[in-house]
């Protein structure tokens, strides 16, 4: 944290811009959820839940400080997604735990961000064995659910590079149910927005 403060202070003193690599703002699952929210079909939002879970029950001993846990390692991305949508919350509560190996920093967390009547829940666990939604959003007029995570990282691990056929391929859809202006219940399969981590640099260019 002190190093980050030093960097931002240095940038401000020299009139420069410094930014972390917030690539998760350009996950396909997040961009799709964002588009649904911005469509207004859900009405006034009351709750959004974000999960980044997997099943890895064994954790080798790897002691470290809080900066080595999941809250600082992954939460900086999933919390940033929420903040990019709604800004700074009115108040926050959180629960950090180490469940697989007590010698290690936190591997499980839940943060709750409150914006008036809207509550945003951000969770990560390595002890979730069933398929659980990546995003769940509820509003006065409807609900949206998206299973499955962005596949760009999976493609990169398989040596499929950006621009190549099949990069980030994902044929899943989101499920949207809402009440339209005629009072009718509408069900929609929402196609995925295209994820693109390269847009981080486009956004930085626009800022500069």
Regions found by a protein language model. Name each.
Residues 14-17, 24-102:
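Predominantly a Rossmann-like dinucleotide-binding segment in NAD(P)-dependent oxidoreductases
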Residues 139-208:
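C-terminal glycine/acidic-rich active-site capping loop/insertion
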Residues 76, 123-131:
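Glycine-rich phosphate/pyrophosphate-binding beta-alpha loops
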Residues 103-108:
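A short, glycine/Asx- and small/polar-enriched loop/turn
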Residues 6, 32-35, 81, 110, ...:
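Alpha-helical elements of Rossmann-like donor-binding domains used by nucleotide-donor carbohydrate transfer enzymes
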Residues 88, 116-118, 142-143, 184:
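Short acidic/polar mixed-charge low-complexity motifs
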Residues 111-117, 137-140:
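Active-site beta-strand termini and strand-to-loop segments that position acidic
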Residues 1-17:
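Rossmann-fold NAD(P)-binding glycine/threonine-rich loop
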């Amino acid at each position: 944290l002190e190093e980050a403060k030093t960097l931002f202070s240095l940038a401000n003193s020299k009139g420069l811009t410094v930014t972390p690599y917030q690539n998760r703002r350009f996950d396909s699952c997040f961009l799709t959820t964002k588009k649904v929210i911005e469509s207004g079909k859900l009405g006034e939002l009351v709750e959004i839940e974000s999960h980044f879970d997997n099943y890895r029950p064994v954790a080798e001993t790897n002691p470290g400080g809080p900066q080595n846990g999941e809250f600082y390692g992954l939460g900086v991305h999933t919390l940033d997604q929420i903040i990019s949508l709604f800004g700074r919350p009115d108040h926050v509560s959180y629960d950090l735990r180490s469940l697989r190996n007590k010698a290690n920093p936190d591997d499980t967390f839940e943060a709750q961000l409150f914006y008036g009547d809207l509550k945003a829940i951000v969770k990560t666990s390595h002890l979730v064995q069933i398929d659980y939604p990546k995003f769940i959003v509820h509003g006065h007029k409807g609900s949206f659910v998206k299973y499955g995570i962005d596949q760009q990282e999976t493609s990169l691990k398989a040596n499929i590079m950006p621009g190549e056929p099949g990069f980030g391929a994902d044929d899943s859809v989101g499920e949207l149910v809402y009440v339209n202006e005629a009072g009718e219940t509408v069900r929609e399969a929402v196609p995925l927005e295209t994820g693109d981590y390269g847009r981080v640099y486009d956004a930085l260019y626009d800022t500069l």
